[in-house]
């Protein structure tokens, strides 16, 4: 009886277990508590380096490797070297994202994290198939700066229902695959970013190694935003991050080194996208392919129009 009353007394007066439980509930409901702000994580140099390296090699380098390696090594009816890069990306990236979430000083909702990872893998896998076929069509004269129906190798196909099939393939590649790939990707990064705050302004600094990674990281995200045609998703994520920074600043909480690195990378990306759009603003051919209000040409469309056509 005495032991029971002692446990009840501890629970009522806020013993260690109760305090931990309260802290956990606060974290689950999205607010950065004082305890969480005090648990500032060191800069994850290893994860950010691996993350940036595999993005450049396995994602950006994927179509380049497909064009560089001899066609005899990877026949058109077999997976290309770029496809194997994509397969590796689909395995390594979710693993790195999970490791990043594990190192967050804030307790993040596991169910949302796991569902996001599952959808990410599904979307990236859908994109793997569609992108593989679309890039293999380059060897047959397919031009990325034209729409599917305007491409010389497709517009005269018989029966015409075959054109519908290629448009469906393009839809899975450029729309459904990208949405299921990038929405959970940016959601996970934002959830991680929401825990990157510290109560100490002295810890709100970017270390030297992080500064060296900002440029390649921001440049990769520029490629991701332009080639993936996800400017709206990116700008929404960036302004959500900015709003969170301003909101936490009122509570005297500041971005830690990891948060500053991610925010700086996104800010550089926004600048590069603006310069890219300004440079190609008056291109009549690309304007025809991207007629909407949001005009963000794809790098590969620029390549097939202005680079490969000269050779």
Swiss-Prot record:
Spans traversing the lipid bilayer: 56-76, 81-101, 111-131, 179-199, 204-224, 225-245, 260-280
Coiled-coil segments on the chain, per record: none
Membrane topology category: Multi-pass membrane protein
CC annotations in GO: early endosome; endoplasmic reticulum; endoplasmic reticulum lumen; endoplasmic reticulum membrane; intracellular membrane-bounded organelle; membrane; membrane raft; nucleolus
GO molecular function: lysophosphatidic acid binding; protein homodimerization activity; sulfatide binding
Result for mutant: residue 238 to T: In CLN4A; requires 2 nucleotide substitutions
Record-linked InterPro entries: CLN6
UniProt name for this protein: Ceroid-lipofuscinosis neuronal protein 6
Organism (species): Homo sapiens
Taxonomic placement: Eukaryota, Metazoa, Chordata, Craniata, Vertebrata
